[in-house]
């Protein structure tokens, strides 16, 4: 199915150009992740590999954090800025509420505001991460620690983050898929060979012969579990709830009824990315505070709540996913606008009053779908973390549920976009021929 779709797509010049453009942008990003920031002692980075929050930071940075590259911040500042801007549109700041109702013009203003906020956050995160990692690496990370060096590193990191954000926007505008998701997707995929190598070394290298059988059984169970997660995730991400729609005025030959499809998980994978981004930065801050000698009870409690390696941290992570799923579901689908659009087009839901009645019906339905979606996302995300505690898996494997969610959801989104374009092209081609 996938390869046939790709084969059909490559036959069309415009589609082929979009796919190749997306691949090119991802390659540019991957090249940037290999360039360590000047002034950084690369050898000191090895002291940071065992930090519990590093895998989460690497996840949201597209795997650019491990070698402290110029793209180390990734799209994390932009993600946080997006959350802030979306919250400000919820009757918190009149100007942002007004922009949210201005259509395309308002969207451009909101995007510009998001970029400015992201730039400020990028500088703040750059300062925090550089100073924090220098402390955690026993003051060896910054090769020549002085104001000028710190300023240069922070400027490079903030600039790198804005470049990554721009690369993501180029994918969204001129390529296929959501740019932010594609950047993170590329980083996760690039880390898969190292993850497989790590599993192989842990279970098959220098292992006594009497333990090889149990290693094969365990890895076999792991593969089956991954395949089941892939199947379950694909099923839920593609599942739809169809709302029946009828029309008051029907043109001759046109159907009198149709349906409005809503995804069972309308928020997609964005809540997982939001939760990962929000969890990672504070976890790093409290790790630094602890390293500086502030071992107060509240610091330990905060560390426990934010570290996905602990039970409390795991459930905090799941809670954030649930919270952002409800939030982003209503960002994606506005019940008031949906009811208004249906009424304008002369459509209605059988048994539901147009206008306010339809809005209330949609709100109630979206809350139910968000409940299903949030439980699904939370379950898939924390399942491997639970398995880590039971089977002693590595932190990288423990984040496999989150990684699989992003990979599968991004892949499905790209395929749907590709299918939609090919279908539209066939339809337009048919209409042109008939004329």
Swiss-Prot record:
GO terms for biological process: intracellular protein transmembrane transport; protein targeting; protein transport by the Sec complex. InterPro entries: SecY, SecY/SEC61-alpha, SecY_CS, SecY_dom_sf. Disulfide bonds: none annotated. The keyword Transport applies. GO terms for cellular component: plasma membrane. It comes from the Bacteria. Belongs to the SecY/SEC61-alpha family. This is Protein translocase subunit SecY. The lineage of its organism: Bacteria, Bacillati, Bacillota, Bacilli, Lactobacillales.
């Amino acid at each position: 199915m996938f390869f046939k779709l790709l084969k059909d797509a490559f036959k069309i010049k415009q589609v082929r150009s979009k796919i190749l453009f997306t691949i090119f942008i991802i390659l540019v990003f991957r090249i940037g992740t290999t360039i360590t920031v000047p002034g950084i002692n690369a050898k000191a980075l090895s002291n940071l590999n065992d930090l519990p929050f590093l895998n989460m930071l690497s996840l949201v940075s597209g795997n650019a954090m491990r070698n402290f590259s110029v793209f180390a911040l990734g799209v994390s500042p932009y993600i946080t800025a997006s959350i802030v801007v979306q919250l400000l549109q919820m009757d918190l700041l009149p100007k942002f509420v007004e922009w949210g109702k201005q259509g395309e013009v308002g969207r451009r203003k909101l995007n510009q505001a998001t970029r400015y906020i992201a730039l400020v956050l990028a500088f703040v995160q750059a300062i925090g991460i550089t100073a924090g990692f220098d402390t955690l690496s026993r003051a060896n990370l910054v090769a020549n620690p002085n104001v000028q060096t710190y300023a240069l590193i922070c400027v490079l990191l903030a600039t790198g983050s804005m470049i990554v954000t721009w690369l993501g926007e180029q994918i969204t505008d001129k390529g296929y898929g959501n740019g932010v998701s594609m950047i993170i997707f590329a980083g996760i995929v690039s880390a898969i060979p190292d993850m497989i190598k790590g599993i192989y070394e842990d279970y098959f290298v220098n292992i006594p012969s009497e333990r090889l059988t149990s290693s094969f059984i365990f890895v076999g169970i792991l593969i089956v579990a991954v395949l089941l997660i892939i199947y379950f995730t694909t099923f839920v991400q593609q599942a739809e709830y169809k709302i029946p729609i009828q029309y008051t005025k029907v043109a001759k030959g046109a159907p009198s009824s149709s349906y409005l499809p809503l995804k069972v998980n309308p928020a997609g994978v964005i809540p997982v990315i939001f939760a990962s981004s929000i969890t990672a930065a504070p976890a790093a801050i409290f790790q630094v505070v602890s390293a500086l000698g502030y071992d107060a009870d509240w610091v330990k409690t905060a560390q426990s709540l934010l570290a996905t390696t602990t039970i409390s941290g795991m459930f905090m992570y799941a809670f954030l996913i649930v919270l952002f799923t409800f939030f982003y579901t209503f960002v994606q689908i506005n019940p008031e606008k949906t009811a208004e659009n249906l009424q304008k087009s002369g459509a209605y839901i059988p048994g539901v009053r147009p206008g306010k009645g339809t809005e209330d019906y949609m709100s109630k339905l979206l809350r139910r779908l968000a409940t299903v979606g949030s439980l699904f996302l939370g379950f898939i995300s924390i399942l491997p973390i639970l398995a880590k505690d039971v089977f002693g898996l590595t932190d990288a494997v423990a984040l496999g549920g989150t990684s699989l969610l992003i990979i599968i959801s991004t892949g499905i989104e790209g395929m749907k976009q590709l299918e939609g374009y090919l279908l539209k092209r066939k339809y337009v081609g048919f209409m042109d021929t008939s004329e």
